[in-house]
Amino acid sequence: MAPLKPAGASRLINKSHLHQLFVERLNADLHNAQLALQTAHEAATHEENVAENKYDTLGLEAGYLAHGQARRVAEIEQALLAFRALQLRDFDADKGIQLSALVLLESDSGQQRRLFLVPDGAGMKVPTEEGEVMSITPQSPMGQSLLGKAPGDFVRVNGQESEIVEAL
């Protein structure tokens, strides 16, 4: 956990920089998924993987793997498009936490979590000097509980209550 900064100083990273870190992460994930798709496609179409009898399923299994990899590539491409289109907005106390908010939560035990509310690509984590930041979507239970809230409010998800310490 990153040490706390002096009073009045933000314990959250700059959102533009954070946004770029997530885009870079998605680009790297896309590259890896495309390589995996290419490998799976080559295995599925390789002449040695043609079934010789009804029990020889290597080619069929490779085809299923290639299909799954193609879906993964499409999911990452969709998330990347959503991230690139995301307009970063400053926190507005009148509206509360909205899409593109960067939120610092603290549990009763003092554990801090940094969350970035994004349209797609939930569950990704990127390391920062301030601490790890995880992407969540408004469709998730945590995302739903944060929408409209402000620093000082409490949220409860999966039986654990946390205070919203800061929102940008």
Residue ranges and their predicted role:
Residues 91-156:
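Non-DNA-binding regulatory cores of transcription-related proteins
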Residues 2-92:
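N-terminal intrinsically disordered, low-complexity, charge/repeat-rich segments that act as generic
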Residues 46, 137, 156-157, 161-162:
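Alpha-helix boundary/interfacial micro-motifs
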Residues 109, 159-164, 168:
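Short, charged beta-turn/beta-strand-edge "cap" motif at the junction between a beta-strand
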